[in-house]
Amino acid sequence: MQFMLLFSRQGKLRLQKWYVPLSDKEKKKITRELVQTVLARKPKMCSFLEWRDLKIVYKRYASLYFCCAIEDQDNELITLEIIHRYVELLDKYFGSVCELDIIFNFEKAYFILDEFLLGGEVQETSKKNVLKAIEQADLLQEDAKEAETPRSVLEEIGLT
């Protein structure tokens, strides 16, 4: 996989993950071009399209489009399944994920993606293992926040 983009029906980019080195200018150009291309397609059209020397695989879930660019020899159906698995992981974590979950918890959406995909390839096929890793990271984060909470001198010596 070269990259994954999540964008709304209005064309607003919500998440982007690039697995190939490109300049910011090139990324913006690609994003703009692909968003326009995908949004212009009719709902009954095929979810695969040839674009430049890549294949684009996309799927719409509610108000979000999940769009991936893959190499010519990669399998479109597996990519569609990868998109679906990512949506399932988001659903499990957020409990029926919506666009607002992605907007306000984008770092979690990226973290889930990073636990699932590594370098554009599936790292972990088990939803259970991915969710367990995310729960453990959440616990670590909570523990770190508790450790940062300043305590009074009386609490330190056990007088409260």
Swiss-Prot record:
Top-level taxonomic group: Eukaryota
Subcellular localization, as worded in the UniProt entry: Golgi apparatus; Cytoplasmic vesicle membrane; Membrane, Clathrin-coated pit
Pfam entry (one): Clat_adaptor_s
A single BP term in Gene Ontology: synaptic vesicle recycling
Keyword Protein transport: yes
Alphabetic keyword roster: Coated pit, Cytoplasmic vesicle, Golgi apparatus, Membrane, Protein transport, Transport
GO cellular component terms, A-Z: AP-1 adaptor complex; clathrin-coated pit; early endosome; lysosomal membrane; presynapse; trans-Golgi network membrane
GO molecular function, one term: clathrin adaptor activity
UniProt keyword Transport, yes or no: yes
Cleaved signal peptide residues: none
Protein task: Subunit of clathrin-associated adaptor protein complex 1 that plays a role in protein sorting in the late-Golgi/trans-Golgi network (TGN) and/or endosomes. The AP complexes mediate both the recruitment of clathrin to membranes and the recognition of sorting signals within the cytosolic tails of transmembrane cargo molecules.
UniProt record similarity statement: Belongs to the adaptor complexes small subunit family.
Summary of subunit composition and partner proteins: Adaptor protein complex 1 (AP-1) is a heterotetramer composed of two large adaptins (gamma-type subunit AP1G1 and beta-type subunit AP1B1), a medium adaptin (mu-type subunit AP1M1 or AP1M2) and a small adaptin (sigma-type subunit AP1S1 or AP1S2 or AP1S3). Binds to MUC1.
Descriptive protein name: AP-1 complex subunit sigma-2
Gene: Ap1s2
